[in-house]
Amino acid sequence: LSLRRQRQMCIRDSLMGERSPHNNPDARGVFFGMSMDSTRADMTQAVLEGVAFGLRDSLEVARSLGIKIERTKICGGGAKSPLWKKIIANVMNLKVDVLEVEEGPSMGGAMLAAVGCGAYPDVETIGKKMAHVVDTVEPEPELVAKYEERYQKFRKLYPAMKDLF
């Protein structure tokens, strides 16, 4: 897999419906842009990029609400993939902090419980204590520009398909 190879394929990964930002439980996934010379590697990378594009959709909702986001955090299995970390950083044009913790949802729940029972005053305080960053991936301007163009095409797929579900 290569981030620099020009691919035309992408995926809308709504395999179990879509929740954010399109609340449509009937939405389904689709590969778009396949051709006879599409490879398994192309499809694999399209899946990784499609998930990152979906994350970007949610990021854009937050930005439209005036929320300023300069970096994001990832953990778990996907965070072990150097390729996927780079894809997320470049699609979102954000610094990506990789956390040491493997089980993010469980850790998040435990952190919220600790705040709720008064062991910590707020989420920021416990986050600084518990969410250890082990790596940071920076976006690369050349790839950010490439992915911006691809993301704009990706955004057009859902409106074009929504009446077909």
Outline where the language-model segments fall:
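A short acidic, often aromatic-flanked loop/helix-cap motif at beta-alpha or helix-coil junctions
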Residues: 17-19, 40, 104-105, 144
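Charge-patterned, long linear interaction tracts outside catalytic cores
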Residues: 144-165
